[in-house]
Amino acid sequence: MLVWFAKFLEQYYSGFNVVSYLTFRSVLALLTALLLSLWIGPKMIRRLQIFKFGQEVRNDGPESHFQKRGTPTMGGLMILATITVSTLLWGDLSNPYIWFSLFVLLGYGAIGFVDDYRKIKYKNTDGLIARWKYFWLSLVSLIAIFGMYALGKDTDATRLVVPFFKEIMPQLGLFYVVLAYFVIVGTSNAVNLTDGLDGLAIMPTVFVAGAFAIIAWATGNVEISKYLYIPYIKYTSELVIFCTAIVGAGLGFLWFNTYPAQVFMGDVGSLALGGALGTIAVLVRQEFLLVIMGGVFVMETVSVILQVGSYKLRKKRIFRMAPIHHHYELKGWPEPRVIIRFWIISLMLVLFGLVTLKLR
């Protein structure tokens, strides 16, 4: 929004052209989201307490979690608000990739809000009925995906990029829709599963979003994309603004979500952030890289799949409890130790993912 205003003001003072610089806007997008979060946070936490929007806790979970019962939840509303405001302020709103990303973020946020509200209203951890939850997640993602496919059909925007192989970039055709669907919905649910400890999900999200800011910049630059043997995609550079807004909002939320948490993001935050990361990965054509950089999310999801599969087939559990972060809690690890070690793993995977851009 401010890009258009600055262009108008340039005729009166040339210094306003600094707003057109992507690096300038990306830093301000991060700072705007961060400072807004720090300002809004205490007010939102008080409101959530007044409305009695408290977290429900599983009765079969670790005993240390019982003290979390009643902690304000749905703090993800703060994350969504600050990301949206920051992106609208500093992004080029003529860029369709900005709107695809915001659509999934807010659409998934709305689904998460209903899910959280039902948990609070009925005082259980069930939320939305699973089939309806996946119906709405699927509908939102498919609307965005078909728009993305129509915009980039038969161009580099619908090619498959395979890490380590610079010559393998097949045109996906309609399989793009299938792949994008599983990436967006899958990532959304993976982040949701990871969000079980104070700050556990938000910091890996910040790491991955920060890395995608770099990748979006490279993909939207003709020379850099050519140098790295990745496809040049016209609209991706503006995703840097969206990614840095996520980083700022995430760090601002972590201020209140760090152990012991004053507020939880709830499904309104985790489903939305996961959907946003999946959408970014699809738009910059780095779905495989998301699997690497989001390895903590993958690990959490796989642990649940293995646990459920093992119990159904053998009537035995592999882990003491799934997702796997609860397994380590039940082994006696203090919650902060689990969180920090998972953060370290996430950072290592993100750095390795960035290195693979050159290993081709």
UniProtKB/Swiss-Prot annotation:
Membrane topology qualifier: Multi-pass membrane protein
Main location class: membrane
Cofactor(s), names only, from the UniProt record: Mg(2+)
Origin superkingdom: Bacteria
Pfam families in UniProt: Glycos_transf_4, MraY_sig1
InterPro entries: Glycosyl_transferase_4, PNAcMuramoyl-5peptid_Trfase, PNAcMuramoyl-5peptid_Trfase_CS
EC number(s) on file: 2.7.8.13
Residues annotated as transmembrane: 21-41, 73-93, 94-114, 132-152, 168-188, 199-219, 239-259, 263-283, 288-308, 338-358
Catalytic reactions of this protein: UDP-N-acetyl-alpha-D-muramoyl-L-alanyl-gamma-D-glutamyl-meso-2,6-diaminopimeloyl-D-alanyl-D-alanine + di-trans,octa-cis-undecaprenyl phosphate = di-trans,octa-cis-undecaprenyl diphospho-N-acetyl-alpha-D-muramoyl-L-alanyl-D-glutamyl-meso-2,6-diaminopimeloyl-D-alanyl-D-alanine + UMP
Keyword Cell wall biogenesis/degradation assigned: yes
Major enzyme class: transferase
GO molecular function terms noted in the UniProt entry: metal ion binding; phospho-N-acetylmuramoyl-pentapeptide-transferase activity; UDP-N-acetylmuramoyl-L-alanyl-D-glutamyl-meso-2,6-diaminopimelyl-D-alanyl-D-alanine:undecaprenyl-phosphate transferase activity
Keywords: Cell cycle, Cell division, Cell inner membrane, Cell membrane, Cell shape, Cell wall biogenesis/degradation, Magnesium, Membrane, Metal-binding, Peptidoglycan synthesis, Transferase, Transmembrane, Transmembrane helix
Recorded metabolic or biological pathway in which this protein acts: Cell wall biogenesis; peptidoglycan biosynthesis
Family: Belongs to the glycosyltransferase 4 family. MraY subfamily.
Function: Catalyzes the initial step of the lipid cycle reactions in the biosynthesis of the cell wall peptidoglycan: transfers peptidoglycan precursor phospho-MurNAc-pentapeptide from UDP-MurNAc-pentapeptide onto the lipid carrier undecaprenyl phosphate, yielding undecaprenyl-pyrophosphoryl-MurNAc-pentapeptide, known as lipid I.
Database matches in PANTHER family: PHOSPHO-N-ACETYLMURAMOYL-PENTAPEPTIDE-TRANSFERASE (PTHR22926), PHOSPHO-N-ACETYLMURAMOYL-PENTAPEPTIDE-TRANSFERASE HOMOLOG (PTHR22926:SF5)
NCBIfam families (UniProt xref): mraY
Identification of the protein by name: Phospho-N-acetylmuramoyl-pentapeptide-transferase
